[in-house]
Amino acid sequence: MINLLINSFAPVAILILIGYISAKKSIFSKENSIAIIKYVGVVAVPALTLKIILSISISNVNWTLIFSYVFSELIIYVTALLIGKYIFNLKWNEAILIGMASSFANHLLFVYPIALNEYNADLINPIVAIIGFDVIFLVINLIILDLIKFQNLKLKNIFIKQFSNLPLLALILGLAIILLDIEIPVSIERALEFIANSAAPCALFAAGIILSQKLEKTEIKISNIIILFKIILHPILLIFIIWSLDNIDFSLAETTIMVASAPVGLMALIFS
């Protein structure tokens, strides 16, 4: 456990700390962090999503475990959304973002890189499956947000608009490559690897910059609610669901529980 903390979590913390200090020293600004996050969301994350999807062994996924996670995620999402709407009196679009931030884990840029170095393929597959679901769930949320923002826009046009969502396209492309058994040229594979490897360091550095910014009291209260749901309640709820089913080995659920207790996901940060 100590080795896991030192070898896997410490590098993540160090990179966030470097971003934090560089912002406090005015080397980087909040605007710089937004530009970095935009690169991560538009370029690096789609490449990483495609790379991860191509690595999954679908036949080896424990779908009972995945559906347990999805069920817990939906409960957290709806509960946090309703608290944002009716206790903090937020607008519906803001409440949806609170729900996303409280339930979406940073599995892509936090859990996956750590797990890749510490666990075998059987424990990596659940993370990849959850990433695939969350990309779809993200698109559903974006459709709802667009319906709220563009009330005069037809649902058909909003649906078509989602195909400009690069992580979704990466997911579809990855599944198509797997199903059609397409061989990727070495040059493309190396470029994909090169871009994908930049996602986590850039996102973590930008997160450090953002953490250095001052928050209003209301924002702090909402942040505390998000932390409570994401870091504490979600893993507890998932563990309870897995325990209730009584047919899932907890040793196989280790990385899934890691995802449930991971920090807030990148996409909620981008769209907020």
Q: How would you name each of these model-derived features?
A:
Residues 1-272:
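Alpha-helical transmembrane segments of multi-pass small-molecule/ion transporters
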